[in-house]
Amino acid sequence: MFSLQDLCRKNTFFLPSDFSKHTLHLLGLYWKGHGSIQRIKNDGVLIEHDLLLSINEALILAGEEGNNDVVQLLLLWEGNLHYAIIGALRTEKYGLICEYHSQIQDWHVLLPLIQDPETFEKCHDLSLECDLSCLLQHAVKYNMLSILVKYKEDLLNVLFRQQIQGLFILACENRKLEILTWMGQNLPIPDPEPIFNIAVVTKDLEMFSLGYKIVFEYMENQGLFHLTQVVRMVMINRHFSMVINKGLLPFVLEILKHGGHVNRALSYAVTQNKRKILDHVVRQKNVPHKTIERMLHLAVKKHAPRKTLNLLLSYINYKVKNVKKLLEHVVKYNSTLVIRILLEKKKNLLDATLTRYVKDSTYFRVKEFMQDFSISPEKFIKIAVREQKNVLIKAICEDIWENPAERIRNLKQIVCTIKYESGRQFLINIIHTIYQSYSLKPEEILKLATFYVKHNATTHFKDLCKYLWLNRGTESKKLFLECLEIADKKEFPDIKSIVSEYINYLFTAGAITKEEIMRVYALEYAMY
């Protein structure tokens, strides 16, 4: 059975304001010098119905006063004993500390909770097996700069200097910039390189920049050492390689601020295929044409991918001045991709220029351009078809192919290479105007008729059939049967209808038999 005191101490109650001091003593809810104390929710206490504190804040206060009764009450309310110890350390209430000493397994656990350096050091001193070196390590870890300042002379002692490097690395790993700055200004750091390595791994640009300040300013001001230009560039180039490999553009720019060479940055960006860095440096630093070509040679040597080569070529508008040097690299390193890109680009540029000529210039200027760049008539005609320039097409056809039959044969071949329907029909119309303008041999007309059928050129085919019937009559039987077969296979109903009409004429004239018709298209002409 619980006592009233146990119930009040273990549970959350609102105490009546008229409880006497004697009653509060009996309940164990009186804090000497403060008044009543009661638990509020899970993590707070209310003192004398007025002051609200967290349980751990109250433990620090009780520890400072050495009030074990209140400490026990607050621990009952799930407070953290460490805070009572911290409070006791502040005011050196070692009696209270001795009371709970056995419950603390490792005094280092308390250190992150302590804000002031004196208490921090007192707490660390309770770890009897630890020495000054351990204290300094924890001072770095928990940002207690004043402790380092206090023991500066010890750190400068010849016997202790060997530990400076370890403390420096620890400060880097924990990213304690204030401590790093102080160490750079006051201590002889044997090797400052870890600050750069760790800054890159953690992507901490501020710490990376501080590293250069330590090396080039603080350490030189201390007279510790002076970097020769060669050693300085070796270090900076190593940093270039490290940060570009990870694609850290802001770090690259930071290195350039501290003496890094643009060409070196470009070289690493090219060899490691970091196009974002390459593009930014080229554009921001106005890199000259000659340097870009050197980077292009390097890219060829390293077999850089297409995107990197294209990017470099774009800076010089795909115009390589030192072609001989480029070809030397291509042959020496068996890296031909750049040549393919240049040839492709030349083709694209020629196509674009020719298109502009077709749209805006006379035939004579177009012809001159074609001759200068050895452009085939087929390429010109395809572009002219796309731009619907029938006059230009007729002009070049007459200029190149004097024989109308040859003209039609070549245009028919071009029709077969055009992939879009409107382009094919446009060129077929031009072919038909040539047919109408000249007298072709019968065999050429027959070939043209089958060509029209294959491309479903209904109107032109009908016109041609009329001519054939009027001029050749029943001699066209074989052609009509062939056209019927093609139209049937390709399912061109309009063509089939036209052919059927002329087959009817042939049948009526006795030039064709029912069996011949049935062999070609039995179902359609079963009536015969």
From Swiss-Prot:
Ranges of the ANK repeats in the UniProt entry: 129-158, 261-290, 292-322
A Pfam short name: DUF249
Inducers of expression: Expressed in the early phase of the viral replicative cycle.
Listed GO CC annotations: host cell cytoplasm
GO terms under biological process: symbiont-mediated suppression of host innate immune response; symbiont-mediated suppression of host JAK-STAT cascade via inhibition of JAK1 activity; symbiont-mediated suppression of host type I interferon-mediated signaling pathway
Bridged cysteine pairs (disulfide): none
Keywords: ANK repeat, Host cytoplasm, Host-virus interaction, Inhibition of host innate immune response by virus, Inhibition of host interferon signaling pathway by virus, Inhibition of host JAK1 by virus, Interferon antiviral system evasion, Repeat, Viral immunoevasion
Subcellular location(s) per record: Host cytoplasm
Function: Plays a role in virus cell tropism, and may be required for efficient virus replication in macrophages. Interferes with host NF-kappa-B promoter activity mediated by TLR8. Mechanistically, inhibits the phosphorylation and subsequent nuclear translocation of host NF-kappa-B RELA subunit downstream of TLR8. Promotes the expression of the autophagy-related protein host ULK1 to degrade host STING and inhibit the interferon response. Also inhibits JAK1- and JAK2-mediated signaling and thus negatively regulates the IFN-gamma signaling.
Subunit architecture: Interacts with host STING1. Interacts with host JAK1; this interaction leads to JAK1 degradation. Interacts with host JAK2; this interaction leads to JAK2 degradation. Interacts with host RELA; this interaction inhibits NF-kappa-B promoter activity.
Family: Belongs to the asfivirus MGF 505 family.
Protein name, per record: Protein MGF 505-7R
Source species: African swine fever virus (isolate Warthog/Namibia/Wart80/1980)
